[in-house]
Curated annotation (Swiss-Prot):
The keyword Methyltransferase applies. This is Norbelladine 4'-O-methyltransferase. One of its GO terms (biological process) is methylation. Keywords: Alkaloid metabolism, Metal-binding, Methyltransferase, S-adenosyl-L-methionine, Transferase. SUPFAM superfamilies: S-adenosyl-L-methionine-dependent methyltransferases. One of its GO terms (molecular function) is O-methyltransferase activity. It catalyses: norbelladine + S-adenosyl-L-methionine = 4'-O-methylnorbelladine + S-adenosyl-L-homocysteine + H(+). Pfam families: Methyltransf_3 (PF01596). It comes from Narcissus aff. pseudonarcissus MK-2014 (Daffodil).
Amino acid sequence: MGASIDDYSLVHKNILHSEDLLKYILETSAYPREHEQLKGLREVTEKHEWSSALVPADEGLFLSMLLKLMNAKRTIEIGVYTGYSLLTTALALPEDGKITAIDVNKSYYEIGLPFIQKAGVEHKINFIESEALPVLDQMLEEMKEEDLYDYAFVDADKSNYANYHERLVKLVRIGGAILYDNTLWYGSVAYPEYPGLHPEEEVARLSFRNLNTFLAADPRVEISQVSIGDGVTICRRLY
């Protein structure tokens, strides 16, 4: 039986349905560790019309920890929005780290740019205003062995995640990580049907159900689907 839209709150882009527990996590663990410029960017983004696309602060800390544990230096980000996850990545990378960041809307990136500049990490970022697929295809054509990436983070058009995966599994080195955001889609992926969603949300929900099944069966990666934010799937490239 399908779930009603009333069963889950879509107010917060978070798989954790206890608002009290979420508030506790953010106020106890996340916000005290949040970089000053990340806090400023978050507060500005929360006032934006598409604020639901903001990566939560606890997820940001998770991404930062993973990047540091991996000693990542070269990363790809597909879907930037105002740049919260991008700034998180730039702060986590070493001084000579490099990020290729791709988004169709530079105006959103420019909202976050002053915070990136104040944090002193703009030099790590190569922002490309474009659809991602042609950029990834060009990168594959020009790629040399030493150009492989350590890490990729995808938070963009949901119906294209599988297409991005086919390219990223070649662009990211063996042992590197590819992360997909929103893969639990408010918890709605657990149900064959989920009445009440807007048509574009339903398209995304079905795309994620298909993606989750596909990634679980992909022998090129090992995966872990983490219940943080709106669900993050980590893929480690095996070959």
